Amino acid sequence: MLKGRSLIDPMDFTVDELEEIFKLADDIIACPKEYMHAAEGKILATLFYEPSTRTRFSFETAMLRLGGQVVGFSEPNSSSVSKGETIADTIRVVSCYADIAAMRHPKEGAPKVASMYSSIPVINAGDGGHQHPTQTLTDLLTMRRTKKRLSNLTIGMCGDLKFGRTVHSLIKAMSRYDNNKIVLISPDELKVPEYIKKEILDKNNIEYKEAKRIEDVIEELDVLYMTRVQKERFFNEEDYIRLKDSYILNENKLKTAKKDMIILHPLPRVNEISYEVDNDERAYYFKQAKNGMYVRMALMAKLMGVL
């Protein structure tokens, strides 16, 4: 039963509960008009303490396509937060007005705190470099629909694996499915944190290896998950400038890749995927973004108990 629950971490739901969400998303994709009144009278509050275009638009569009409405803020300066209001007080007040809330915050753990004081479901829309569970649902749905499975996959994760919350969440999620292999492709400065290796990969006996060049491992991959080097996570601009062009995927590097490999990216991209790749049949990142709207529709409908 998902009604009334929050989603803070991709591990909050069982594999069976995730499948329930994915099946509803499949149904919505097949016939979206059947669900256009599902959330009539319901209100989503978007509490975005950090800039976002795609995630916020995806949540808002998802709620509107369910027939609901949206209130909220897209930067803290436009809310009582700028006056010093705590997260606990903000969510208590928001709970009086809305039926569900989506929160993005630069501090790790902020959505978790909000969920502890909230009387409505809270969805973590990204907290610092920590977790991004709805992007993970998007990634899983896309793999499930294209590869027809979430097990027995070799997944390459490339770019910023240190600060990339989407990568951390996806590694967590994929560790729950059988016989997956993870290939971590990054420069030394942006390697996946040790706690991810110890607490998730090693603890769950997930096979993984590290590489420094895409071309050395691309022929093994069923999925290539590209990420951008995130300027906002760097304290030193010189380090950002030095590392931002570390990995650029182009058609030449795809020559040895499997014909049915899929390329994913949480977006926005900067220059890590050449525009020439957009026309490759393996490029799925824009379809992936659309899947994000559908999976958020399914998730919110389940948490509100309207479907």
From Swiss-Prot:
Enzyme class: transferase
Gene3D superfamilies: Aspartate/ornithine carbamoyltransferase
Gene: pyrB
PANTHER family per the UniProt record, alphabetical: ASPARTATE CARBAMOYLTRANSFERASE, ORNITHINE CARBAMOYLTRANSFERASE, MITOCHONDRIAL
Biological processes annotated in GO: 'de novo' pyrimidine nucleobase biosynthetic process; 'de novo' UMP biosynthetic process; amino acid metabolic process
Binding locations of L-aspartate: K83, R165, R228
Residues engaged in binding carbamoyl phosphate: R54, T55, R104, H132, Q135, L267, P268
Free-text function comment from the UniProt entry: Catalyzes the condensation of carbamoyl phosphate and aspartate to form carbamoyl aspartate and inorganic phosphate, the committed step in the de novo pyrimidine nucleotide biosynthesis pathway.
Self-association and partners: Heterododecamer (2C3:3R2) of six catalytic PyrB chains organized as two trimers (C3), and six regulatory PyrI chains organized as three dimers (R2).
Protein name: Aspartate carbamoyltransferase catalytic subunit
MF terms in GO: amino acid binding; aspartate carbamoyltransferase activity
E.C. designation(s): 2.1.3.2
Family note: Belongs to the aspartate/ornithine carbamoyltransferase superfamily. ATCase family.
Organism: Clostridium acetobutylicum (strain ATCC 824 / DSM 792 / JCM 1419 / IAM 19013 / LMG 5710 / NBRC 13948 / NRRL B-527 / VKM B-1787 / 2291 / W)
Keywords associated with the record: Pyrimidine biosynthesis, Transferase
Superkingdom per UniProt: Bacteria
Residues in coiled coil: none
Pfam families from the UniProt entry: OTCace (PF00185), OTCace_N (PF02729)
